[in-house]
Design a protein with these regions (language model features):
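Cell wall/extracellular polymer interaction/catalysis modules
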Residues: 1-111
C-alpha cells in the first residue's frame, strides 16, 4: 500500500504538502525544507516514526508533521491527526500489508 506525500508549496524553510493513502487525501503535511527527506520511495519500518505532531518546522529534522493546514509554516490539530494516521498504519501492519512511503515534489511551487 502506498502512503504518498505530495509537496505543494515551499516558502523559506517551510514545505507544505498533503498526505494520501492509496490516492485518498488524509491530511496536510509540513516539513523543514533544510532537513526533509529527498523525494523517492521508502519502505515503512517499525523502528522509527516519520510522522510528528509538531505544528511548526523547528526541531522536525527529517520527520513529517501531519495535521490541518492553518497558514504557511503552521499546522493545527496535529496530535489527533497523527494518532489517527498511526492507528491506521498499525492496523495495516497487523494485517501484514506492505507499506511504502513515496515523497513527490512534482508540481511544487516555490514562493
Amino acid at each position: 500500500m502506498e502512503i504518498r506525500v505530495e509537496r505543494e508549496i515551499s516558502f523559506r524553510q517551510a514545505v507544505h504538502g498533503r498526505l494520501l493513502v492509496d490516492g485518498d487525501r488524509v491530511c496536510d503535511t509540513l516539513e523543514n525544507g533544510a532537513t526533509c527527506m529527498k523525494p523517492g520511495s521508502y519502505p515503512l519500518v517499525r523502528s522509527y516514526s516519520l510522522f510528528s505532531a509538531a505544528n511548526g518546522i523547528h526541531r522536525l529534522g527529517e520527520k513529517i508533521a501531519v495535521g490541518e493546514w492553518q497558514y504557511l509554516g503552521f499546522l493545527v490539530r496535529t496530535q489527533p491527526v497523527r494518532e489517527q494516521l498511526l492507528t491506521y498504519i498499525r492496523q495495516l501492519r497487523h494485517r501484514q500489508v506492505p507499506l511504502v512511503l513515496v515523497i513527490s515534489e512534482e508540481g511544487m511551487q516555490r514562493l
